Amino acid sequence: MPQRMGSFANPNDIFFDMSSFHWNVLAIIGARHVRKEDVKTKQDVIQYLSEWSEFERAVYLATFEIPCGKVCTYQRIAERIGRPKAMRAVANTLHNNPLYPIVPCWRVVKSDGGFGGEEKAAASRRKHVESEGVLIMNGKVVIRDDVLF
């Protein structure tokens, strides 16, 4: 039988499910929570990332908009979000993408068309971009105006 908080006679008798607690609190305060598997639109992304920093939200939203068959550079994303010198911060943010594969971080490349990071991860991103029809030569995206977003 669940115990009231403050009347715990035996710690083994405590029944407290944090996930239920989380949803109950959200219901009480009227907040809408979006589960990762329900994220499909730009508005869903905004809502899912509501507690993330403004910078992180901007990076993930800019990346979310990159269409299949196109790539964008870390530099261009940094410029798009108004932080032109923050290329490395963009890369670090995308490295921790909480909305993979909804936010297509594999479509973001270095300015020379290369894939940064560890070779195994870079090879996976390279393969993914190539499967979307992007031309790869010598392990890098061939940067052309018709491919850049």
What are the functions of these language-model segments?
Residues 24, 28-149:
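Nucleic acid-binding interface residues in structured DNA/RNA-binding domains
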Residues 5, 17-18, 48:
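Intrinsically disordered, low-complexity segments
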